[in-house]
């Protein structure tokens, strides 16, 4: 299935993305190849193959909750650019980025 450059531009507009003409051409070609590969996979006969939801053979691997000694605070704070009251101070990411 061929993905047209117009379809790429349409989806880009919906996603509020902008691409150059060469990027649009590249995306159209790449997406067409991806869709072709998925269509090829859809042709594979999976009759009689058990449904697989995970490749891991273990579920809910648990360990004992044991307190362990952490990193030496003096060593940890040695490379910290800013600290306050024995805490590492970082820029706030909410409320306009002011101090937390």
From Swiss-Prot:
Kindly state which reaction or reactions the protein catalyses.
Answer: L-glutamyl-tRNA(Gln) + L-glutamine + ATP + H2O = L-glutaminyl-tRNA(Gln) + L-glutamate + ADP + phosphate + H(+); L-aspartyl-tRNA(Asn) + L-glutamine + ATP + H2O = L-asparaginyl-tRNA(Asn) + L-glutamate + ADP + phosphate + 2 H(+)
Q: What is this protein called?
A: Glutamyl-tRNA(Gln) amidotransferase subunit C
As for what it does, the entry says: Allows the formation of correctly charged Asn-tRNA(Asn) or Gln-tRNA(Gln) through the transamidation of misacylated Asp-tRNA(Asn) or Glu-tRNA(Gln) in organisms which lack either or both of asparaginyl-tRNA or glutaminyl-tRNA synthetases. The reaction takes place in the presence of glutamine and ATP through an activated phospho-Asp-tRNA(Asn) or phospho-Glu-tRNA(Gln).
InterPro entries in the record: Asp/Glu-ADT_sf_sub_c (IPR036113), GatC (IPR003837)
Which Gene3D superfamilies does this one have?
Answer: Glu-tRNAGln amidotransferase C subunit, N-terminal domain
Q: Name one GO molecular function term.
A: asparaginyl-tRNA synthase (glutamine-hydrolyzing) activity
Q: What is its EC number?
A: 6.3.5.-
Q: Which terms are listed as keywords in the entry?
A: ATP-binding, Ligase, Nucleotide-binding, Protein biosynthesis
> Do you know which PANTHER family this protein is assigned to?
GLUTAMYL-TRNA(GLN) AMIDOTRANSFERASE SUBUNIT C, MITOCHONDRIAL (PTHR15004:SF0)
Q: How does it assemble?
A: Heterotrimer of A, B and C subunits.
Q: Which family does it belong to?
A: Belongs to the GatC family.
Q: Which GO BP terms, alphabetically?
A: glutaminyl-tRNAGln biosynthesis via transamidation; regulation of translational fidelity; translation
Per the UniProt record, one Pfam family is GatC
Q: Which SUPFAM superfamilies match?
A: Glu-tRNAGln amidotransferase C subunit
Gene (UniProt): gatC
């Amino acid at each position: 299935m061929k993905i047209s450059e117009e379809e790429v531009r349409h989806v880009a507009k919906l996603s509020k993305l902008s691409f150059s003409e060469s990027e649009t051409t590249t995306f159209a070609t790449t997406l067409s190849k991806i869709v072709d590969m998925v269509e090829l996979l859809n042709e594979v006969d999976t009759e009689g193959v058990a449904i697989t939801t995970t490749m891991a053979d273990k579920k809910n691997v648990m360990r004992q909750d044991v307190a362990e000694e952490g990193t030496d605070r003096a060593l940890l704070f040695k490379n910290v650019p800013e600290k306050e009251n024995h805490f590492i101070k970082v820029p706030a990411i909410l409320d306009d980025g002011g101090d937390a």
